[in-house]
Amino acid sequence: MTKELCMRCYISGRVQGVWFRASAKNLAEQLMISGWARNLADGRVEVFACGKEDKLEEFYTWLQKGPLNARVDVCTRENLPWEDYITFDVL
């Protein structure tokens, strides 16, 4: 059985105004990942995501590239204990 866990990621580069959060939500829903994504005042996007470990790995790989018009310079990740979220929200 695949382990469930959460992760918090900070993504910097050209990641605001390029549909990064909406695209992340679409993929998260396809992968059955819950959590949220929000813009930060410093220009980064913060993502908190919970799901099965293999699905989170796939999601993290995507976060390192982002949608077509994005340019990801840095994507940091911190693994966290499981939290039971139901949906993936854009904040």
From Swiss-Prot:
Keywords: Hydrolase. Gene3D superfamilies: 3.30.70.100. The keyword Protein biosynthesis does not apply. Transmembrane segments: none annotated. Residues 6-91 form the Acylphosphatase-like domain. It comes from the Bacteria. The active site is at residues 21, 39. Its EC number is 3.6.1.7. It holds the Pfam family Acylphosphatase. It is an enzyme of class 3 (hydrolase). GO terms for molecular function: acylphosphatase activity. It catalyses: an acyl phosphate + H2O = a carboxylate + phosphate + H(+). PANTHER family: ACYLPHOSPHATASE. Belongs to the acylphosphatase family. This is Acylphosphatase. The lineage of its organism: Bacteria, Pseudomonadati, Pseudomonadota, Gammaproteobacteria, Legionellales.
